[in-house]
């Protein structure tokens, strides 16, 4: 029963994507494998954070998404799926080419997960001028975009996307997705566009 429940849960979330979209996203890989586990742990010695809700990695030409089952697995699924989708987006759209220009003047990503864990990014998280979902979004551009996507896909985030800087980032991300996956002319409002 647990296995079936988890598979049903996964299928419900994957059904939020238009037909053919995920297939196009994984066309750059031999396969995509999604694994549900009890927990994901890391260490400073390995250059990773101590705990994670999800990870995405490559093994040869196979893409993997590993999710820690629990309350945060929905956001983790969308976050890690975005990482898989981004390969297709960057190769089929120019919308994200100027991403850095959407950040505050003088801002630089950490380009290091461990350094990011020590960052105080509160100046960029003020409600009226919010430029990032959270401090983790300031680690790498890819994490910034994945964090925006995961929150755009889930309920209850209206106030998060009320700030103009984050709204511009969401618009740019949605434009890139539409361009890359041939959805520019679709009249449908997709789940990730619910806060536009």
Regions found by a protein language model. Give the residues of each.
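Zn2+-dependent metallopeptidase catalytic core
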Residues: 1-31
